[in-house]
Structure formats: C-alpha cells, structure tokens
Amino acid sequence: VPADCDPPRTTHAALAARLGDARLLTLYDQATWSEGPTWWEAQRTLVWSDLVGRRVLGWREDGAVDVLLDATAFTNGNAVDAQQRLVHCEHGRRAITRSARWLPRRWA
C-alpha cells in the first residue's frame, strides 16, 4: 500500500530541513514486510529483504525488481562489505551470512 504522506512530514527540525520538498516514490509494492535496505554500488541496485516472503529483492535503476535470494532464513538486514559482497542478518538462523559469489541474472 503506497504511503499517504506526500510530502513526508516530521516534527524534527533538522530532518525537515534535510527533506526539503522531497516526495515519496513507491518503487515496489509486492513485498509483504520490507526491511534492511542497502545500496549495492557495484551492481547499482537497491537491495532489501521481504521478511515474510523469505527473499532478498533488488531494484535496479531501470525500474526492474529481481529476486536476488529466495527461501532465505527470514533475512531482515543487509549490508555490502568492502569486497562488494552482500552480507545478511538472518532472523531464522540467528546468523550473519555472506553471498560470496554473485552471478547476474541478466546481462545489459
């Protein structure tokens, strides 16, 4: 469900100054419970978890959304390490895991 607060509102003066006239944009609305967004510069992809859907998704600048990982152990946090590998916090296993090797699903 798209957020119904455009422009974003806040009572925090410093945040309000930073937001300026920013507008909210819905990039994807097919996730049940989204958490853990991070920007993966090497792939120019916004990565986040669909916790309930048990998958990690990636939004590319052309608007496409790919399933990067499926059947996860309830991944709820993501990061990118110095070698540009994805690192995930897994709620189900109470573990931190890393995607050591990455093969693109599509070639530009």
Locations of the language-model features?
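Sequence-structural signature of mature extracellular/luminal beta-sheet repeat domains
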Residues: 1-108
